[in-house]
């Protein structure tokens, strides 16, 4: 049915449409010199095009160019898929209303800003040597993140495994029984970050596994 590849472009476009008018109304009264935004926040691109100011994109993940395409994973959806058609209609309406580029699937995931800051080490990016001077690889920018407290691994000398499903696609309760079965008999410590999953909903948590929702990730990773 297309699944994620069909849904994500539509969701990005729909989200942009929810607030782009408010953004433009605000910026028209105090026109900025440039617009800086996350590469997935396509309202930033729409606004920069509409106001005719430089578009500065921030990448906390992999950027694309002619030799490496993020969009490729989203393009193999039939053109007559309902969500692909809905996305195309939104993109066309934005181009007509705001005078912006046509936000195709290719443009959403592989489009560039006039200047691009990539928060990764250059050598971790596929084909990094093929990116031009409009891309600057700053390396990872990490704050102290003290809001979630601190954490110490059990003092038993065993290796520590940290499990986290990440930021975007993490509502997967079926994952945790699979994890628990995989690590139950291993002589290691495990910390599983749950995000929105209620710890009380999980059954038969192994003795070597600790779970938490909002966790001090940097503390855990440092150990």
Stretches with model-predicted labels:
Residues 100-103, 197, 215:
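Short coil/turn linker and secondary-structure boundary residues
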Residues 22, 215-216:
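Short acidic active-site motifs
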Residues 216-223:
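Short acidic alpha-helix that forms the nucleotide-activated donor recognition element
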Residues 167, 177-213:
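Catalytic donor nucleotide-activated moiety binding site of glycosyltransferases and closely related
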